[in-house]
Amino acid sequence: MKTLLLTLVVVTIMCLDLGYTTKCYKTGERIISETCPPGQDLCYMKTWCDVFCGSRGRVIELGCTATCPTVKHHEQITCCSTDNCNPHPKMKQR
C-alpha cells in the first residue's frame, strides 16, 4: 500500500513538472511577474527612445516571447530563459 502511494506521488510530481512554464516580468500599468503562456519560454526586455527620451529616458517594455524579437533601428533587446530574468533596470538598483 505504501509503495502504491509513493508511486502515485512520484508520478504526480513528474506530471506537474512537465507542465512548467516560465515566469517573466511584464510592463503595463505597473510591472508584474506573470506566468508566460504555453510556448512562450523566453523573457525579453526591449528599450528604445521616443520624443521624450531626453527628459524621461528610454522606453522599456518587458514580457514573454516564443523567440527573441528582431532588433529594429534604435532598439535594444535582451532575451533570457530563467524565471524573472528580465527585471526593470530600476528594480536592479534596489
From Swiss-Prot:
<keyword id="KW-0732">Signal</keyword>
<dbReference type="Pfam" id="PF21947">
    <property type="entry name" value="Toxin_cobra-type"/>
</dbReference>
<feature type="signal peptide">
    <location>
        <begin position="1"/>
        <end position="21"/>
    </location>
</feature>
<dbReference type="InterPro" id="IPR018354">
    <property type="entry name" value="Snake_toxin_con_site"/>
</dbReference>
<comment type="similarity">
    <text>Belongs to the three-finger toxin family. Long-chain subfamily. Type II alpha-neurotoxin sub-subfamily.</text>
</comment>
<keyword id="KW-1015">Disulfide bond</keyword>
<dbReference type="InterPro" id="IPR054131">
    <property type="entry name" value="Toxin_cobra-type"/>
</dbReference>
<keyword id="KW-0528">Neurotoxin</keyword>
<keyword id="KW-0008">Acetylcholine receptor inhibiting toxin</keyword>
<dbReference type="GO" id="GO:0099106">
    <property type="term" value="F:ion channel regulator activity"/>
</dbReference>
<dbReference type="GO" id="GO:0030550">
    <property type="term" value="F:acetylcholine receptor inhibitor activity"/>
</dbReference>
<keyword id="KW-0800">Toxin</keyword>
<dbReference type="GO" id="GO:0090729">
    <property type="term" value="F:toxin activity"/>
</dbReference>
<feature type="disulfide bond">
    <location>
        <begin position="68"/>
        <end position="79"/>
    </location>
</feature>
<comment type="function">
    <text>Binds with high affinity to muscular (alpha-1/CHRNA1) and neuronal (alpha-7/CHRNA7) nicotinic acetylcholine receptor (nAChR) and inhibits acetylcholine from binding to the receptor, thereby impairing neuromuscular and neuronal transmission.</text>
</comment>
<keyword id="KW-0964">Secreted</keyword>
<keyword id="KW-0872">Ion channel impairing toxin</keyword>
<protein>
    <recommendedName>
        <fullName>Long neurotoxin LNTX37</fullName>
    </recommendedName>
</protein>
<feature type="disulfide bond">
    <location>
        <begin position="24"/>
        <end position="43"/>
    </location>
</feature>
<dbReference type="GO" id="GO:0005576">
    <property type="term" value="C:extracellular region"/>
</dbReference>
<dbReference type="InterPro" id="IPR045860">
    <property type="entry name" value="Snake_toxin-like_sf"/>
</dbReference>
<feature type="disulfide bond">
    <location>
        <begin position="80"/>
        <end position="85"/>
    </location>
</feature>
<feature type="disulfide bond">
    <location>
        <begin position="49"/>
        <end position="53"/>
    </location>
</feature>
<dbReference type="InterPro" id="IPR003571">
    <property type="entry name" value="Snake_3FTx"/>
</dbReference>
<keyword id="KW-0629">Postsynaptic neurotoxin</keyword>
<feature type="disulfide bond">
    <location>
        <begin position="36"/>
        <end position="64"/>
    </location>
</feature>
